[in-house]
Regions:
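Aromatic- and charge-enriched surface segment that lines or borders ligand/interaction sites
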Residues: 81-123, 272
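A bilobed periplasmic-binding-protein/Venus flytrap-type ligand-binding module shared by bacterial periplasmic
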Residues: 96, 196-201, 258-281, 285, ...
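Detector for C-terminal structural segments
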Residues: 285-315, 365-374, 396-509
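N-terminal lobe/hinge region of extracytoplasmic solute-binding protein
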Residues: 33-86, 117, 178, 497-498
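Surface-exposed binding/hinge segments that line
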Residues: 84-88, 92, 126-168
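Append "and occasionally in soluble cytosolic enzymes with long acidic Gly/Pro-rich linkers
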Residues: 274-374
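Gly/Pro-rich hinge or "lid" segments in bacterial periplasmic/extracellular proteins
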Residues: 74, 155-206, 210, 220, ...
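Ligand-site clamp/hinge motif
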Residues: 171, 199-244, 383
Length: 509
């Protein structure tokens, strides 16, 4: 009866999530289920200058950036034809000709200038990344001047916030946002996006007429939707369900290694965590290999630092402490934390070492990590109170947490600077735990102004080592991304940077 109830509940959720968008006769419709779209992801919209909505605009084929990453995570021209650094602070970008927004207006230097100016006026991260002080346009060229050296400016322009849109159409109505992509928004809610093909797309007429993207955050419901044919493809399936689709001729999968990393920030306002020995004890208590093998079911690898080994500044460049609960207990004892009452948990001055582990639930693996961490830390003598909630932002804001675990793409630009500037600097937007180290700040400053690739790699590795050696953060695993789909789906493949999903070549027979 319990199983039947779950099945009925899943079916009800499925109907609610997927709606009843019926295909018109002869119309090719692609239905896509994902937990990666929605308010909790800060991407429920198509305005690239608002939070992470640019990810939706790029992922779902509404817009494009001046440059895009290839499979080796190297930036290549997309809307741009070429670029040239005039000096260390100035780059001149030549745009491709005869590209039009879905509004019918031509993409010109002036249009790109207007878009980028709106971007840096409204998007804090873009403003910090790009450091733009001036933009000029002439014909099909746009020249960008930055206040300081930005060696990876071209990489940053690949970020979805750099999606080029027609500002003359405004950004207040998602259905009117006009990009250059193969699809246009017909309707949009926090739960669903309906797109129709752009018949005037410069790259050729899209092979699919209509795309329906549904936000399905429950993993079992998502898997059931694909099994029942309610959707044609899914991203973010629970790893336990992947064999259902990998081992069936009716389906196929596309996988790739990514820099999406399961990591945890320490709250440096928590007195106990101000002691490096306690932070290191927490890190040594995390059984990363087991998490990658069991909870991720081999769809990830244990992390040494913030970056995976396939990047030149990741992997072997950093050496993290091994899983060692006994060694962790010794560190806690050195810090004055011992089990004085025999209850299995360490205490100090009559107070147990109780830590609050905050995470969110819309990424399937994070609650599993929280439960595993609770068990691992218990073995060390640390009491862990876990809080997997999609209201995590409120807890962060109120400071009601000690360890915050999340999944984050640490190198979406193919470079280490993105992670350092967003998480590690004292003023970083996502430095939730108020980590600060003047030596690290200095190294990041050097890295940010260095143009030579070899030196950038050397500095990035040095910064990573400093973070790991000081137990500033806990790096747990690097994720492999997998898309599952019906065998009749073509032109739908996973990409290392997690930006690109729906293209003109997507089709379903």
């Amino acid at each position: 009866m319990k199983f039947l109830a779950l099945l009925v509940l899943s079916a009800a959720l499925l109907t609610s999530a997927c709606g009843n968008n019926a295909a018109t006769d002869g119309e090719k419709v692609f239905r896509y289920g994902t937990p990666a779209y929605g308010i909790a992801n800060e991407n429920a919209g198509m305005d690239p200058h608002e939070a992470y909505q640019g990810w939706s605009a790029i992922r779902y084929g509404v817009g494009e950036t001046l440059f895009k990453f290839d499979d080796a995570m190297q930036p290549q021209p997309w809307l741009a034809e070429k670029y040239e650094f005039i000096n260390e602070n100035t780059v001149k970008i030549t745009l491709k000709d005869n590209i039009y927004f879905t509004s019918g207006n031509k993409m010109t230097g002036a249009a790109v200038k207007a878009c980028l100016e709106d971007l840096i006026s409204r998007h804090n991260r873009a403003r910090v990344d790009l450091k733009i002080t001036g933009i000029t346009a002439e014909g099909q060229t746009v020249t960008i001047t930055s206040a300081a050296k930005v060696p990876v400016l071209i990489n940053y322009l690949c970020d979805p916030y750099g999606c080029i849109i027609d500002m003359s159409r405004g950004t207040g109505d998602d259905t009117k946002i006009s990009g250059t992509g193969p699809f246009m928004v017909e309707s949009l809610t926090p739960k669903e996006v309906v797109l129709v093909k752009n018949p005037a797309y410069y790259g050729g007429v899209p092979k699919t007429d209509r795309i329906i993207v549904s936000s399905i955050t429950d993993g079992n419901t998502l898997a059931l939707a694909l099994q029942n044919g309610e959707i044609d493809a899914a991203q973010g399936l629970p790893y336990a369900s992947l064999p259902l689709f990998k081992n069936s001729a009716a389906y196929k999968t596309s996988s790739t290694d990514t820099s999406r990393t399961f990591l945890a920030a320490f709250n440096f306002n928590t007195p106990a965590l101000q002691d490096e020995r306690v932070r290191r004890a927490v890190v040594m208590s995390l059984d990363k290999e087991t998490f990658a093998r069991v909870q991720l079911m081999g769809n990830g690898i244990a992390a040494a630092g913030p970056f995976p080994p396939n990047l030149p500044f990741g992997g072997a460049k950093v050496h993290a402490p091994e899983y060692n609960p006994q060694g962790a207990r010794k560190l806690l004892a050195e810090a004055g934390w011992t089990d004085t009452d025999g209850d299995g948990y360490v205490d100090k001055d009559g107070q147990p070492l109780t830590l609050r582990w905050l995470t969110y639930s819309f990424r399937q693996e994070l609650p599993l990590l929280a439960e595993a961490a609770q068990s691992w830390l218990k073995e060390t003598g640390i009491c862990l109170e876990i809080n997997p909630t999609d209201g995590y932002a409120d807890f962060l804001r109120r400071g009601e947490w000690d360890i915050y675990a999340k999944a984050f793409v640490t190198a979406p630009t193919g470079d280490a600077q993105y992670y350092f500037t967003t998480h590690v600097l004292k003023e970083s937007a996502y430095n939730s735990g108020n980590y600060y180290n003047p030596d690290t700040e200095s190294l990041i400053g050097q890295h940010g102004s260095e143009f030579r690739p070899e030196k950038r790699t050397e500095l990035a590795a040095a910064i990573s080592r400093k973070l790991v050696d000081g137990s500033a953060f806990a790096y747990i695993a690097h994720l492999k991304m997998t898309l599952a789909m019906k065998s009749t789906v073509q032109g739908f493949a996973a990409h290392p940077c997690d930006y690109y999903e729906i293209t003109k070549d997507l089709s379903i027979d």
